[in-house]
């Protein structure tokens, strides 16, 4: 009797656990200069986030991206890519674009207005397929570049992109013959982890280099 009860209780708890959601929250400044909390949610053990909640002191709006609107968010950064908005939200997504019908990693840039994500740039693709990205002011102009690790024909690239007027342009890059896995950075330095160890990322004469 007790054994069946315990088994039944365990099954119910396990199902509820599997159906529960995990979340991550961060703050962003909207177009009116007001602080907004952005929360991403996904089912436990799912790989990607597709539920976005935006909230301030008075209101809450939740957006669920599914079917043809699925985003599959795998990374997020906030920063300021140009002078058009107070702050930008940049998502790394894994989906199909209207003009590039292949599932792949992409970079989407949004601003926040009235608790809505306003698309600023949704890339069909960058120069080459990306494995990671971050925001970093690599040239010291006061605005963040979208810096991406790209892979093409066995080579690794670190490319920096500027976004303006609804388009994105690669302005700096470096080419490397070894595997580069991901970005890490603190307040001062942008670094990458590679098969040869960890290096800081630098820029000289418009060329990205590792030091």
Label each PLM-derived region with a short phrase.
Residues 1-11:
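N-terminal Sec-pathway targeting helices
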Residues 15-211:
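Beta-propeller-forming repeat regions
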């Amino acid at each position: 009797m007790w054994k069946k009860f315990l088994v039944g209780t365990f099954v119910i708890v396990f199902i509820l656990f599997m159906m529960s959601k995990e979340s991550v929250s961060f703050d962003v400044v909207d177009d009116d200069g007001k602080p907004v909390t952005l929360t991403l949610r996904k089912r436990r053990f799912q790989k990607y986030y597709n539920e976005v909640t935006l909230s301030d002191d008075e209101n809450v709006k939740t957006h669920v991206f599914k079917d043809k609107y699925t985003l599959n968010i795998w990374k997020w950064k906030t920063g300021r890519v140009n002078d058009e908005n107070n702050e930008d939200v940049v998502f790394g997504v894994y989906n199909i674009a209207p003009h590039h019908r292949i599932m792949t990693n992409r970079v989407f840039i949004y601003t926040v207005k009235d608790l809505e994500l306003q698309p600023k740039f949704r890339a069909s693709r960058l120069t080459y397929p990306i494995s990671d990205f971050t925001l970093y002011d690599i040239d010291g102009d006061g605005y963040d570049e979208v810096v991406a690790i790209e892979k093409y024909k066995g080579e690794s690239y670190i490319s920096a992109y500027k976004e303006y007027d609804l388009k994105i342009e690669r302005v700096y890059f470096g080419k490397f013959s070894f595997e580069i896995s991901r970005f890490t950075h603190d307040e001062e330095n942008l670094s990458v982890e590679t098969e040869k160890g960890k290096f800081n990322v630098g820029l000289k004469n418009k060329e990205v280099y590792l030091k």
